[in-house]
Amino acid sequence: MATHFIVGCGAVARNNEGKFLMVKQMGGYWRGQWIFPGGKLELGETLEYCARREFIEETGCDLTIKKEIGAYVSYDPNTDFEKQVVLVYFLGNGLSGTPKVGEGVTDVAWFHMKDIEDMAKKGQVPGLILKVASDSIQ
């Protein structure tokens, strides 16, 4: 049973074609899967600042945080990751820069919602991330 919690924040960005910017996680909880840029909240940070900082670190791009999409809880007792993760995702806009592989990721790419749904069926996108994508367009 998880006895520790981690708070993380992430940012969701979409381009004019409706595609989502995603990163392929190098390690950690979702190693090898496509997710939205994000990471751990550091002491003294606001949730919005954390989401933006992680987005910049992982994609090399900046964005403006527009609104909160939602808060989500993730825990899988079948992994060796013995922490419950509380994640807060934000919708961003005004993307500046060209996406590139940044800290802790092995790839960065744009995907349509249909692509994300298909990748989730193949285990390449966590179910929680599929829900965040869906919630962001509601």
Segments and roles (model prediction):
Residues 29, 33, 103-138:
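Nudix hydrolase/Nudix homology domain
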Residues 62-70:
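A short coil-to-beta-strand element that immediately follows conserved catalytic motifs
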Residues 19-57, 61:
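Conserved Nudix-box catalytic region and its N-terminal flanking loop in Nudix hydrolases
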Residues 9-11, 68, 90:
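A structural signal for short, well-ordered beta-strand segments
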Residues 15, 73-98:
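Active-site-adjacent beta-strand/loop module that shapes the phosphate/pyrophosphate-binding cleft
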Residues 1-20:
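Conserved N-terminal beta-strand and adjoining loop/helix that marks the start
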